[in-house]
Regions:
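C-terminal amphipathic/interface module of NAD(P)-dependent oxidoreductases
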Residues: 229, 247-257
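NAD(P)-dependent short-chain dehydrogenase/reductase
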Residues: 134-180, 186-187, 194
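Rossmann-fold scaffold of SDR-type NAD(P)-dependent oxidoreductases
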Residues: 6, 52-58, 98, 205
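Mid/C-terminal beta-alpha module of Rossmann-like enzyme folds, strongest
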Residues: 191, 198-242
Length: 257
């Protein structure tokens, strides 16, 4: 099996390629330098010339807050880029795995979201990932994997942000009224590599066990790091909050168990 993995410089793409290497599965990782996903011609050239058995599409615009000010660019990456890859996968009749987000839901209610619940994104980022889902769903061979609150050794994430702000400021304000499941890309990559070797196409939710608020997550980060940082819990209406998104975007991952 030979796989193409986009977004290899990000935390998930990096770990997926490593997991493939550990299993002696050939995986070619590309980033914007090797294949700009917004360039349809380049996407076609790279995928068609590689003789790949499947494409794992990790590359994405993930800066949620910045997306509100950069709608066109976020759409170009998350929607147009996804379409470019999907078109070639459909033409070659090879599977495509697309990573989406819990932010395709509005976060209302008290229960965790299931795979085929109605989608209603509240922000630009969630909307573009939803539109990407609609594109990928048209492929006969597709995996849509919704993930949440991911963190890993490579790339940027909430843990690294908290550690940086803790050192710079000594105090942070973090929302305590948004609940989710922090998910380690090392664990996620194992599931992804297992899944891509099957023909069990469809939509999946993939997160680690357990739920917490961003505030609880931040407190645990500083505890594990042995840092003395003042963490103030605030709600999402607070002007100095780090996160401003759906209240309860947490997703039910029982299908993948």
């Amino acid at each position: 099996m030979k796989l193409l993995v986009t977004g290899v410089k990000g935390q998930l793409g990096h770990d997926i390629v490593n997991e493939c290497n550990n299993r002696n599965i050939e995986a070619v990782g590309v980033d914007v330098e090797e294949m700009d996903i917004t360039d349809a011609g380049k996407v076609a050239e790279v995928i068609k010339s590689g003789n790949y058995n499947a494409v794992i599409h990790c590359a994405a615009w993930t800066a949620v807050d910045k997306a509100e000010d950069e709608v066109e660019l976020c759409t170009k990456v998350n929607v147009d880029g996804t379409r470019n890859i999907a078109n070639i996968c459909k033409e070659l009749d090879i599977p495509m795995m697309y990573f989406s987000t819990d932010y395709v839901f509005d976060g209302q209610g008290e229960t965790e979201w299931k795979e085929y619940d109605e989608r209603h994104p509240l922000n630009v980022y969630g909307q573009t990932k939803y539109e990407g889902e609609l594109i990928v769903e048209t492929l006969p061979k597709h995996f849509i994997v919704r993930i949440a609150w991911v963190f890993g050794i490579n790339g940027n994430n909430f843990i690294k942000t908290m550690l940086r702000l803790g050192k710079e400021r000594g105090a942070v304000c973090v929302v305590d009224d948004q609940i989710g499941s922090p998910t380690y890309t090392y664990d996620l990559s194992k599931l992804v590599v297992d899944m891509i070797q099957t023909d069990k196409y469809g939509i999946y939710h993939a997160t680690n066990e357990g739920l917490c608020s961003w505030y609880e997550f931040a407190c645990e980060i500083f505890k594990q790091a042995g840092m003395s940082v003042e963490v103030t819990p605030v709600d999402m209406t607070h002007p100095n909050t780090i996160i401003l998104n759906p209240i309860r975007p947490s997703i039910d991952h029982s299908v993948v168990k």
